[in-house]
Each structure stands twice: as structure tokens, then as C-alpha cells.
Amino acid sequence: MSIQAPRGFNDILPGEQYGWRDSYRWQRLEEIFREVARLYGYQELRPPMVEYVDLFIHGVGATTDIVTKEMFNITPRGDDPDARRMAMRPEFTAGLVRAWLENGLYNNPQPTKIFAYGPAFRYENVQKGRFRGFHQLDVEVFGAQDPAVDAEVIKLGLDVVARLGLTGLVVSVNSIGCPQCRPRYRQALQDHFRPHLGELCEDCNTRFEKNPLRLLDCKRDADHPAQRTAPVTLDYLCDDCRRHWEGLLSHLAAMGIPYQIDTRIVRGLDYYTKTVFEVLHPKLGAQSALWGGGRYDGLIEIVGGKPTPGVGFGMGMERVLMVLEEEGLTAPFADRPRLDVFVATLGEAARPVGLKLLYALRDAGLSADIDYLGRSLKAQMKYAGKQNSRYVVILGEDEVRQGVASVKHMDEGTQESVPLDQIISHLRRAEA
């Protein structure tokens, strides 16, 4: 029987040979994200990976692909007193809103600026850059309407990837209006697409009545002539949305962020209002969006709170790491942690002394390891080299009798005898 990971799920593994799946690269990306988020004044919130389906039906949208096609639903046991259906989270924003409300974070000084990261799950058609189990870096701001905040979250994401050396990105922005001006735009879309319904896919026909903005998000009919001539949201914005839109563009220009206006961006979730954006990289082809987000001023009210503005983004970790690999950007991962000391022992008398030294090294804050397979000294040295150890402390029975050990500096190839009770201080001096 051959057991493999489910299709669309990936193992993240220790070792450079695994490319974008190298766990150290993931750790570095997470570290950089945390550092940048904290520089911007964001604090971490860790929501559960499972939420009630109702949260996504009402928050994300009952007609979205996520809810109708892509969620990994969980059916509780029959004897579960709380028998409502649950689902693995397909995205972060709705769960973070729920946590903000349930835990009364609105009572804290506002706005609330939070970040989160971790796995999410969608039953996708697996292809390059699109998986069923994927990971996101997420930031959200609750309680601020200022378009400067929209610009801030865009800049935050750009600062993260800039630390990784990633350039050549395209920031695409649009505004999809608000509940006051969107009805006119919805009507304009329906008037435009109605004569073409017989030529459009089944999904488009379903969306036509329930959420015509999603017609612009269709991948199957993206090249249909009616798509290219469809009305654009910017022509239907109310005065408030237009001021917000112009404010966003002004802030992006002031920050020196190049952008393009793409009126086809509507995002795939129903909660968006006003600003929507995507950051693209051409190396990913059809899945060129590394991250995207926007404003959702009605979501908190939909989930059960008071009317509260919000804005944020979700960045695909897999996609960022895949692009870094394709661009050959390995410098951010060059400072890979090394094993400080490998303790090589030879003979029964040396073994307990080596183990005692091993734990003393670790207690002193030095990473250390020892052979557990009974290998020869030559094999232990070879293994220490593969572990990229800085030093090897060699203990044989003669060294134990003399109260010393041989310390080999692996980078320099030098070796010297050091009293056992001075090993740690010797290594610290060597590193100074």
C-alpha cells in the first residue's frame, strides 16, 4: 500500500533541495512578515482553523465559489449537541471578524490592527500556484475609513516582499462602490449582459440575478466580447466612494507606489466595498496574483456587529515562495541556521562524558547534537559535515582519561586540544 499526501496538499520539508517547500524558507518568510507587521503597529490574532459554515455563508457570500464549490465541510458526530455544520477555513477575514466581535476587541482603543498567518483550505482545481491546502499571511484593520489605511495595507505587503528582494510586481487597483451606488451599477451590468446570457456559462447565468458583479470574475468567459465592453464601476461611484477612490490614488502616489487601474478586479468574495486590489507577478501565469484584498465596510455588521469599516489582504505564501525560487532569489535564505557543535565519541568510556557535554552545550545556548547510531569516528565526522556543523568536539577514551577533548574548527580545518571544563568558554571566544 502506497500512502501519499492528498492531492493539492504539500509537505514542507527541512532542506535546501526542496526548493520553495524548504521549511527554512517558510520560517524566514513568516519572520519577515511578523517583523514588518509589528513595525506598522499590528498585533497577532490566532483564530481556529474551523468555523461554522454559517459564518462563511453570510460573510463571504452564499453564491460565491468558495461557499458553493470549494469549502471543506465537516459533519459533526450524530451525538454532538452542537450539530451545526462546520468547515475548515477557506480564508481568514471572516474568522478574524468573528473573533474580534466574540472577544470584545472593539472595546479596545480603535482602530484594531491585526495580523495572522497559517493554513487555509479550498477544494480547488489543482494547478501551478493553486492548491487545496495553502497558507496565507493576513492583515486586517477594523474601525478606520481613511483611504490612507487602504494604502498602508498595500504598502505593508510590498515591504514584506521587498525584504526578500522581489521586484517587478504590478499593483492593480479598482473601486467597486458601496451599497448606495452599487445598485445602479448592478442594473447597468444586467442590462449589458442580458442579451448575451445564452452565450455565457452556467455560473454566469446563476450570478446574473444574484450577484452580477461576479460576472466580471468569470474565468471561463473572460474573452467573451461582452466582457470587454462591460460597464465599469468607476463610472457609477457615488460622491463618497469617488472621494475615497481619489484619496487612495493620492496616497499611493505620495508613497511612490506605481499602480495600474484594472476595472475588472471585483475579487471573489461578496463582502468587498470600495477599494479592491491585487498584486501580480507574471511568472505565475494564470495564477499571477501573489496577494489581494480590499475594503469591507459592511462585513462586521453582517456578522453581527455594529457598522464598522474594515480593510485588509491575504497573501499566498506558496505563491511568493514559488516566485522567489523562479527568480533565483536565495539571498534572504543564505543565513540558514547551522549546528554549532557536533559531539563525536569513540569508545564506551567516552559516551557518558559526551552526553553530559552535549546537554551542557545546549544549556549554554549552543545548538548541539551527538551520534545515536554507533557510527565510526570517520562516519561521525562525515555526518557532522553534512549537518554543516561549525565545530566537532572529539572525545575518545584517551581524551577522557586526560580530561580534554579535541575541538575541530570545521570551516578552518584546524584542530586543538581543550580541557573539558573549558570547552564552552573556548567555543564562545572562537565565535567572538
Curated annotation (Swiss-Prot):
Q: Which reaction does it catalyse?
A: tRNA(His) + L-histidine + ATP = L-histidyl-tRNA(His) + AMP + diphosphate + H(+)
Enumerate the InterPro entries for this protein.
Answer: aa-tRNA-synth_II, aa-tRNA-synth_II/BPL/LPL, Anticodon-bd, Anticodon-bd_dom_sf, His-tRNA-ligase, HisRS-like_core, HisRS/HisZ, HisRS_anticodon
UniProt keyword annotation of Aminoacyl-tRNA synthetase present:
yes
What does the entry give for GO biological process?
histidyl-tRNA aminoacylation
Q: Which GO terms describe its molecular function?
A: ATP binding; catalytic activity, acting on a protein; histidine-tRNA ligase activity; transferase activity
**EC numbers:** 6.1.1.21
Instruction: Please provide the record's keywords in A-Z order.
Output: Aminoacyl-tRNA synthetase, ATP-binding, Cytoplasm, Ligase, Nucleotide-binding, Protein biosynthesis
Where located? Cytoplasm
Gene Ontology annotations for the cellular component aspect, listed alphabetically: cytoplasm
Looking up Pfam families in the UniProt record yields: HGTP_anticodon, tRNA-synt_His
Q: What is its main location?
A: cytoplasm
Which top EC class applies here?
A: ligase
Q: Please give the superkingdom of this protein's source.
A: Bacteria
Q: How does it assemble?
A: Homodimer.
Tell me which family the UniProt entry assigns to this protein.
Belongs to the class-II aminoacyl-tRNA synthetase family.
Task: Name it.
Answer: Histidine--tRNA ligase
Q: Which gene encodes it?
A: hisS
